[in-house]
Amino acid sequence: MTNIRKTHPLTKIINNSFIDLPAPSNISAWWNFGSLLGICLILQILTGLFLAMHYSSDTTTAFSSVTHICRDVNYGWIIRYMHANGASMFFICLFMHVGRGLYYGSYMFPETWNIGIILLLAVMATAFMGYVLPWGQMSFWGATVITNLLSAIPYIGTNLVEWIWGGFSVDKATLTRFFAFHFILPFIVSALAAVHLLFLHETGSNNPSGIPSDSDKIPFHPYYTIKDILGALLLILTLMVLVLFSPDLLGDPDNYTPANPLNTPPHIKPEWYFLFAYAILRSIPNKLGGVLALAFSILILAVVPLLHTSKQRSMMFRPLSQCLFWLLVADLLTLTWIGGQPVEHPFITIGQLASILYFTILLVFMPVISIIENNLLKW
């Protein structure tokens, strides 16, 4: 009798995705982040669900309801901090996952890559709306500043912003709809993640060498299941150390002050994982220009496959491209630092230079260096 695992319509899908899936024999720890993102998503949905049971999406009670969760609900504090810091872990894994894709040429699977970009945008939207829900000072002013950027769109801008707000300022209607969207989006992300996997399993995984691995495949279970479990344990350990020892390390103190439309905080800034994009936005003195640069800072990922000029897929055997990649990482860290600094003399210039460098590396240096490396192969 054939194993039910391989014949039953439901278990067959799981079997073909996580058990008998043929996987390259040489994929490194950089391939762990996909499963870690899945764990992050499940964790966020579960903790978020329990938070939603006690949260009130009304401007008069939102801040108090979050305080109530932390003080009065059984283990509410740990659920709240796991959710807040879980978002940070989610983005760390996301950035590593995208970085891996750029380094090893995984963007050569166009469907998987493009759905990945849509996933990134959806998770960013979810995180932004989640940050508004506690209704602290940074929640309110962050929502005001970021939604206001849409007013830079010619002709329809102002109407669009007022439509999103549900009034003439960020108020009760805005908070209620943000809660509704924040609740539904993770489930849309889950569906997109399933499609992401579906397209990945059409082609099979890439591997560090960038060379087709059809001649040397191993079953996913037990080799990569045990590897993923190790990754998951490290992820949960890191998260719990953050939650239990310094839960407010990555947060903003201003968010412990209830939202006040009459008092603007001295430095309005988003959560740390948006600072690189925020720095790019601020580095352009023109409003529409800044908004376009902000959008393109993420959408540029869609252009990367079109600019792949190298004869090799991966950067494993391309030292010049490797140097450029790590320069890009350093540049993004610089932008993250600048995004959290006030708009003053040295920081403005550093931010502008870092923004120019970011786009130049991806649009100019990468393709040019790849062509140079192709010519070096002839020597």
Swiss-Prot record:
The chain crosses the membrane at residues 33-53, 77-98, 113-133, 178-198, 226-246, 288-308, 320-340, 347-367. Keywords: Electron transport, Heme, Iron, Membrane, Metal-binding, Mitochondrion, Mitochondrion inner membrane, Respiratory chain, Transmembrane, Transmembrane helix, Transport, Ubiquinone. One of its GO terms (molecular function) is ubiquinol-cytochrome-c reductase activity. One of its GO terms (biological process) is mitochondrial electron transport, ubiquinol to cytochrome c. Its main location: mitochondrion. SUPFAM superfamilies: a domain/subunit of cytochrome bc1 complex (Ubiquinol-cytochrome c reductase) (SSF81648), Transmembrane di-heme cytochromes (SSF81342). It is found in: Mitochondrion inner membrane. Binds 2 heme b groups non-covalently. Its cofactor is heme b. InterPro entries: Cyt_b/b6_C (IPR005798), Cyt_b/b6_C_sf (IPR036150), Cyt_b/b6_N (IPR005797), Cytb/b6-like_sf (IPR027387), Cytochrome_b (IPR030689), Cytochrome_b_C_euk/bac (IPR048260), Cytochrome_b_N_euk/bac (IPR048259), Di-haem_cyt_TM (IPR016174). Component of the ubiquinol-cytochrome c reductase complex (complex III or cytochrome b-c1 complex) that is part of the mitochondrial respiratory chain. The b-c1 complex mediates electron transfer from ubiquinol to cytochrome c. Contributes to the generation of a proton gradient across the mitochondrial membrane that is then used for ATP synthesis. The cytochrome bc1 complex contains 11 subunits: 3 respiratory subunits (MT-CYB, CYC1 and UQCRFS1), 2 core proteins (UQCRC1 and UQCRC2) and 6 low-molecular weight proteins (UQCRH/QCR6, UQCRB/QCR7, UQCRQ/QCR8, UQCR10/QCR9, UQCR11/QCR10 and a cleavage product of UQCRFS1). This cytochrome bc1 complex then forms a dimer. Heme 1 (or BL or b562) is low-potential and absorbs at about 562 nm, and heme 2 (or BH or b566) is high-potential and absorbs at about 566 nm. This is Cytochrome b. It comes from Melogale moschata. The gene is MT-CYB.
